[in-house]
Amino acid sequence: MADAGLFIGWGAPVRGREAKGLEVFSEALAYYGRLQQEGVIEGFETAILEPHGGDLQGFVLVRGSEERLAQLRVDDEFVRLSTRASLIVEGVGVIGAALGDGLEATIGTYQQAISELT
């Protein structure tokens, strides 16, 4: 079971770059699918959000081990796709996330910090 995730979020496409945005989006989904088939990641889920007045328009949640996802963040193709996306979509961000068994360790760290600071 995955203990970590990468939350990859994005906002609105740059005006005039919408078609390229879909092209890079398709490249990214194919890349994540390949990573899943190769066992590099456990899986991924894609969400397109309904209009809500905020900046976030969609995200991909990539699931895997903390170690594998740390390696993925510096993988040449991941960096290339993230760079391409940031040139055609506003507000691209990659954020680490605790999932599954990783939640226990994260909450433990938080609880320890609370006890040290109170």
Describe the function of each predicted region.
Residues 57-59:
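Histidine-centered divalent-metal-coordination microenvironment in nucleic-acid enzymes
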Residues 71-83:
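Amphipathic protein-protein interaction modules
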Residues 1-55, 64-74, 94-118:
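Short S/T/G/P-rich N-terminal loop/turn motif that feeds into the first structured element of a domain
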Residues 80-98:
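Conserved short beta-strand edge segments in small beta-sheet-based binding/regulatory domains
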Residues 63-64, 82:
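Functionally constrained cores in energy, signaling, and assembly domains
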